[in-house]
């Protein structure tokens, strides 16, 4: 039936109005998509398995000019691939070419005259990466057409130029799982005839849609964090080739046209003038091609390259020319636009194909200039690191594992990082070797390092001034994404900018994890302690899963001359089997956790190990509220952090099914961001209250915290602008005496607090509270939106985390002046005891993009430690 259905839809697709490449002859020995998949490039949305099968068929048909590389595998088991296309001579010695490309990328190792030889002989490498959002469908169709054209075209001088002067890397789909979801949903929603109505089922994706991957991540925000396997595989492949041009092909609203750079303001501070000049060269070439074919387009609007986690900006921070291409999306085979025109899937394929081929031709034409720009970028980066700060020192005494993970993540982006092997002297301090990492600044990735580690990346001043004017007039700002992302700030790792080399003995990190070596544990008379932190939390989650009994310290104590903080894990021999040392050693090694054997439990100061303040932990039974009305990203981030980051088993239950759940089967219920008023009525709210009183732990975040406060589950209120409580009536407007303050007179009487566009705000924590276990009392909190909550009163709960005062509030990014007084000293983490249980509320999403490691630790503290309290 499905095959017959597909045939019907193919027949109904309007015939293409233009050939992909008019007048081009193609080699019949190279298969078309129709021969492999049964449809043309522009006639049908090709499923991911058929995309891979077709590229494999192309590589097999032209083995002298193409090689299909498997770069990784998605969470759902689908392969991610990259097709490499070049001349027969170059492909025959591909490994040697790649080695030379990597040599060009590191000017420090080049001998006299070698740079000129490399520039003279090396190809320009252009990477075309497609479909990072699975429902942006035409780009993958274009990817297959691009590959076919480059391998099958005969007598085409432009293709000859491309093969002679360049290597082309084609990643056909960065998000196969999302594409598969879209194809299934779109096919299921189709009628007998194609339906162009925007409201038709085939255009209306059910939650969560195809944009996101299995864990509901936006993979176009993951380039530097690399939390997802799709990203890690792609980045590793690109670092193997060090491409000089990287184009990320997307889709946008069906009522738009086509976007290619030059980009909108603001640009990233670390982009060079020559990179911008070359971006203009590519823009002009695309404009000429589009004008020739009568295609509408725009640029210098909407899409900027400020945030370094995009497919356009991460490559630019490495020295490449990066670009985002956006095509209006039919979100199916045909869409009726608001102007009355019909947009087809085939139109999108044609437009992307045209831009992509124009790009590789332009790169080939300007090969030498592009290679020199790339080399100059990398060489000047090294020189920049020879003045100013010579080394960036990353350290965390309270959580060495946090610093280690940060260092490992930097290495994934090709950044050189060294692990300290001895104490490090810097700035009059001596740092322990454990948890200390050194980033030399005189390396080719200097600009990327500054992008990722500096506390603040400045934004164009004129642009910011215009946004202030817009905000004053109650117009939305034009900031496309967050304004801060400093990894040390979000990971609770101290950054020290050393003005001279520390001289400490170090070990260079590579792409393997540098774990603490606890391959064996000696027998201990009493048991073992595990100082709390990210490594310990992951180790305890596995230990509980494996049936090891663990207790948790509810207060500080001193034992054996060492101080231990709240949350320290206590694993007693008497609670466990005789093979505890072996089992615990294996678990600790996997996670890098420190384990301290103890032969007596006589505490000299602080809480005794047998105190009533020691709680017994059990593996928590966690329910994650799934589906609408949860915000897609928030649901996915929470599930990823639980299941993959910390190894916590989780049951995802759709919000619409909560009424059928026996809450007593669960210890923890997590409500991701969202307004649950429609899904959780009065009856379910009463059940949640009773469940908490019986010992359950409920966790809310961002918009679900606003919902919990509004319905009375949480004893605080969301504020309106100026501090008025949500729900209070504004005062009646009065006519002011003249003269008046015009802006004040026209301000609305009731509005949300000023929006914060993704800034990092200083958060202060009560380190005596178990929710703050593993922290040093101060972290960076990613604040995005208009949420401000009043502090909970002491008789109802504890404000475990609050924002700093106005003068110390902003760590990085933009917080508008009007927002600072209202944010300052307000809570971002509230603990409200409810009978024998808890309601734990975060003002923001602690799992933001899974790269806010410091607040993620607070979240997992709530999950692991809450049920035992």
What are these regions (language model features)?
Residues 1-8:
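Sec-dependent signal peptide recognition
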Residues 6, 147-150, 165-188, 192-194:
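Carboxylate/His-rich catalytic cores and anion/metal-binding grooves
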Residues 13-141, 145-169, 215, 221-222, ...:
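Intrinsic-disorder/low-complexity accessory segments
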Residues 172-177, 186, 249-256, 704:
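Short, solvent-exposed turn/loop segments enriched in Gly/Ser/Thr/Pro and often Arg
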Residues 185-203, 224, 231, 243, ...:
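Active-site cavity-forming subdomains of large catalytic enzyme subunits
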Residues 198-217, 728:
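Aromatic- and acidic-residue-enriched carbohydrate-binding clefts of CAZyme catalytic domains
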């Amino acid at each position: 039936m499905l095959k017959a259905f597909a045939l019907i839809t193919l027949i109904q697709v309007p015939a293409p109005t233009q050939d992909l490449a008019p007048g081009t002859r193609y080699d019949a020995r190279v298969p078309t998509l129709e021969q492999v998949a049964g449809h043309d490039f522009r006639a049908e949305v090709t499923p991911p398995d058929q995309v891979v099968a077709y590229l494999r068929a192309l590589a097999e048909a032209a083995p002298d000019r193409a090689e299909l590389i498997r770069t990784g595998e998605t969470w759902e088991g689908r392969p991610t691939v990259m097709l490499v296309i070049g001349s027969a001579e170059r492909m025959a010695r591909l490994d040697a070419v790649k080695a030379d490309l990597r040599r060009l990328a590191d000017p420090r190792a080049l001998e006299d005259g070698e740079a000129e030889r490399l520039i003279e002989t090396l190809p320009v490498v252009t990477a075309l990466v497609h479909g990072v959002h699975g429902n942006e469908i035409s780009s993958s169709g274009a990817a297959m057409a691009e590959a076919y054209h480059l391998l099958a075209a005969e007598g085409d001088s432009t293709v000859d130029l491309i093969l002679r002067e360049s290597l082309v890397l084609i990643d056909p789909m960065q998000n196969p799982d999302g594409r598969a979801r879209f194809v299934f949903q779109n096919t299921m929603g189709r009628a007998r005839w194609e339906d162009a109505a925007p409201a038709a089922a085939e255009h209306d994706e059910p939650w969560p849609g195809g944009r996101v991957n299995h864990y509901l991540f936006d993979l176009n925000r993951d380039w530097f964090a690399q939390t997802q396997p799709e990203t890690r595989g792609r980045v590793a492949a690109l670092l193997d080739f060090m491409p000089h041009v990287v184009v990320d092909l997307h889709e946008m609203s069906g009522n738009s046209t086509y976007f290619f750079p030059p980009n909108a303001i603001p640009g990233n501070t670390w982009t060079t003038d020559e990179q911008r000049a070359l971006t203009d060269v590519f823009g002009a070439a695309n404009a000429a091609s589009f004008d020739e074919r009568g295609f509408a387009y725009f640029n210098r609007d909407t899409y900027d390259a400020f945030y370094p986690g995009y497919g356009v900006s991460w490559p630019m921070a490495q020295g490449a020319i990066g670009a985002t291409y956006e095509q209006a999306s039919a979100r199916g085979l045909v869409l009726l636009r608001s102007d009355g025109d019909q947009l087809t899937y085939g139109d999108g394929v044609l437009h992307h194909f045209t831009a992509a081929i124009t790009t590789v031709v332009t790169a080939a034409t300007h090969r030498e200039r592009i290679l020199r720009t790339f080399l100059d970028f990398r060489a000047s980066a090294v020189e920049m690191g020879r003045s100013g700060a010579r080394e960036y020192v990353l350290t965390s005494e309270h959580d060495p594992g946090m610093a280690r993970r940060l260092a490992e993540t930097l290495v994934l982006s090709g950044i050189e990082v060294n692990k300290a092997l001895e104490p490090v002297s810097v700035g009059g301090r001596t740092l322990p070797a454990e948890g200390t990492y050194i980033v030399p600044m005189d390396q080719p990735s200097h600009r990327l390092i500054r992008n990722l580690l500096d506390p603040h990346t400045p934004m164009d001043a004129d642009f910011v001034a215009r946004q202030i004017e817009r905000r004053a007039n109650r117009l939305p700002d034009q900031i496309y994404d967050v304004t801060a992302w400093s990894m040390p700030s979000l990971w609770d790792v101290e950054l020290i900018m050393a003005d001279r080399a520390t001289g400490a003995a170090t070990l260079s990190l590579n792409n393997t994890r540098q774990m603490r070596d606890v391959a064996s544990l000696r027998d201990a008379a009493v048991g073992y302690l595990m100082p709390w932190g990210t490594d310990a939390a992951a180790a305890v989650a596995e230990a509980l899963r494996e049936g090891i009994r663990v207790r948790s310290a509810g207060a500080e104590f001193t034992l054996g001359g060492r101080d231990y903080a709240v949350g320290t894990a206590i694993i007693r021999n008497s609670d466990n089997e005789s093979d505890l040392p072996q089992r615990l050693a294996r678990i600790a090694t996997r996670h890098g956790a420190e384990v301290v054997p103890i032969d007596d439990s006589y505490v000299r100061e602080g809480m005794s190990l047998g105190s009533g303040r020691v709680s017994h932990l059990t593996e928590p039974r966690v329910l994650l509220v799934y589906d609408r009305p949860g915000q897609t990203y928030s649901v996915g981030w929470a599930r990823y952090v639980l299941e993959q980051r910390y190894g916590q088993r989780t049951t995802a239950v759709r919000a619409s099914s909560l009424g059928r759940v026996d809450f007593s089967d669960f210890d923890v219920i997590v409500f991701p961001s969202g307004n649950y008023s429609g899904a959780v009525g009065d009856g379910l709210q009463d059940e949640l209250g009773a469940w908490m009183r019986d010992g359950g732990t409920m966790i809310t975040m961002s918009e679900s915290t606003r919902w919990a406060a509004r319905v009375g589950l949480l004893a605080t209120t969301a504020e309106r602008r100026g501090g008025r409580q949500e729900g209070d009536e504004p005062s009646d407007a009065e006519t002011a005496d003249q003269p008046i303050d015009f802006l004040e007179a026209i301000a609305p009487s009731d509005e949300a607090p000023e929006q914060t566009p993704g800034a990092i705000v200083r958060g202060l924590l009560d380190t005596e509270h178990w929710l703050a276990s593993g922290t040093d009392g101060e972290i960076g909190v990613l604040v995005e939106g208009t949420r401000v909550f009043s502090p909970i009163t002491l008789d109802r709960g504890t404000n475990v985390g609050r924002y700093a005062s106005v003068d110390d509030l902003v760590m990085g990014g933009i917080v508008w002046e009007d927002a600072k007084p209202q944010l300052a000293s307000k809570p971002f983490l509230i603990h409200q005891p409810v009978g024998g249980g808890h309601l734990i509320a975060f003002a923001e999403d602690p799992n933001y993009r899974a790269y806010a490691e410091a607040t993620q630790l607070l979240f997992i503290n709530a999950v692991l430690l809450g049920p035992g309290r």
